[in-house]
Every structure is written in C-alpha cells, then in structure tokens.
C-alpha cells in the first residue's frame, strides 16, 4: 500500500447536507423547513423555555435556596494520595500544589480518610476528617489541625 492509495474508512466521511439546491437533490423546494409557519421564516422559532404562551415551567416552580457568599470551598484529597511523599516529609497545601497532588488551593485543603497510608508524614495547614487523622497517626505521622 502506498500513500496515494489510502482511503478513509467506509462510512466515516459524509457529504454535507446542501439544502435548497434544486428538487433533484431531495432537499430543494422548502429546504427541510416544511410548509409555512413561524419555523419556516428566517429567524423563525421560539426562544428556549417558551411553551406557546402558557405559564412556562421555570415560572411555575418556586424559587428555592441561595448561594452563601461566605461559604469556604475546600479541595479534598484522600490519604492514599499522600503515599507519593517520602517518610518524614512535612506536607502543606503549598507542597501539595507544587507536587501536583491538587490543581488549585481554593480556601484550603481537606484530607479525607479513604485508602491506606504507608508513609510516616507530618501534615500541616489542612483540615482533616476523623478517619484521616486516625490513619495518619496510625502510620506514625503527625497532624497539625488548623
């Protein structure tokens, strides 16, 4: 086989739908828009959520809740992600960011207790779940809670 003999896989290349180019094409005359009406006109159609004039669903349902602008957003990781560090390493949110364990530190890092920890580490400047504290201390590490 040579480069000039290469063919695309059967069915992978589809011809574009050329509408309004004569009746012989099968998409002439009304160009797939049917007969008259709002949708046949240029710029026709209704806006999203419009239900023909009846009260739309988004207005029938009550508003609920609010966004607390003071809420703290924490990036959460599990203790098994800390196994990449050497024994005795001091871990802070900055170190986690530097080693790409987390992609960003929002209002802080919270360490959760899923998985197993084999390394003895000193973890500072984070929030912890109870199970994470137990697992870090069981592995011989230290926890400094903020």
From Swiss-Prot:
GO terms for biological process: translation. Residues 1-54 are annotated as: Disordered. One of its GO terms (molecular function) is rRNA binding. Keywords: Ribonucleoprotein, Ribosomal protein, RNA-binding, rRNA-binding. PROSITE patterns: RIBOSOMAL_L15. Residues 21-31, 42-52 have a biased composition (Gly residues). The keyword Zinc does not apply. GO terms for cellular component: cytosolic large ribosomal subunit. Belongs to the universal ribosomal protein uL15 family. Binds to the 23S rRNA. NCBIfam families: rplO_bact. Part of the 50S ribosomal subunit. This is Large ribosomal subunit protein uL15. It comes from Clostridium botulinum (strain Alaska E43 / Type E3).
């Amino acid at each position: 086989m040579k480069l000039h003999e290469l063919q695309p896989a059967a069915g992978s290349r589809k011809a574009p739908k050329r509408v309004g180019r004569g009746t012989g094409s099968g998409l002439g005359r009304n160009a797939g828009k049917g007969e008259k009406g709002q949708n046949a006109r240029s710029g026709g159609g209704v806006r999203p959520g419009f239900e023909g004039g009846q009260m739309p669903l988004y207005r029938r349902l009550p508003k609920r809740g609010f966004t607390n602008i003071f809420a703290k957003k924490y990036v959460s990781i599990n203790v098994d992600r800390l196994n990449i560090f050497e024994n005795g390493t001091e871990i802070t949110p900055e170190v986690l960011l530097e080693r790409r364990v987390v992609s960003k530190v929002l209002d802080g890092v919270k360490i959760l207790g899923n998985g197993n920890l084999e390394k003895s580490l000193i973890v500072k400047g984070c929030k912890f779940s109870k199970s994470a504290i137990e697992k870090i201390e069981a592995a011989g590490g230290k926890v400094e809670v903020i």
